[in-house]
């Protein structure tokens, strides 16, 4: 049981980080295009 909880926590954290990186990159691209 403890092993299953750790595995579920690992993929969830990686997906959250990737989503944040994409949002930051999209915002930076918009700022550069506006400038």
Curated annotation (Swiss-Prot):
GO cellular component terms listed in the entry, alphabetical order: nucleosome; nucleus
Sequence positions bearing Phosphoserine: 9, 21
Primary localization: nucleus
MF (Gene Ontology): DNA binding
GO BP of this protein: cell differentiation; mitotic chromosome condensation; nucleosome assembly; spermatogenesis
Nucleus recorded as keyword: yes
Its job: Protamines substitute for histones in the chromatin of sperm during the haploid phase of spermatogenesis. They compact sperm DNA into a highly condensed, stable and inactive complex.
Name of this chain's protein: Sperm protamine alpha isoform 1
Organismal lineage: Eukaryota, Metazoa, Chordata, Craniata, Vertebrata
């Amino acid at each position: 049981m403890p092993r299953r909880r750790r595995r579920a926590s690992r993929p969830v954290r990686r997906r959250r980080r990737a989503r944040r990186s994409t949002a930051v990159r999209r915002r930076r691209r918009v700022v550069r295009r506006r400038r």
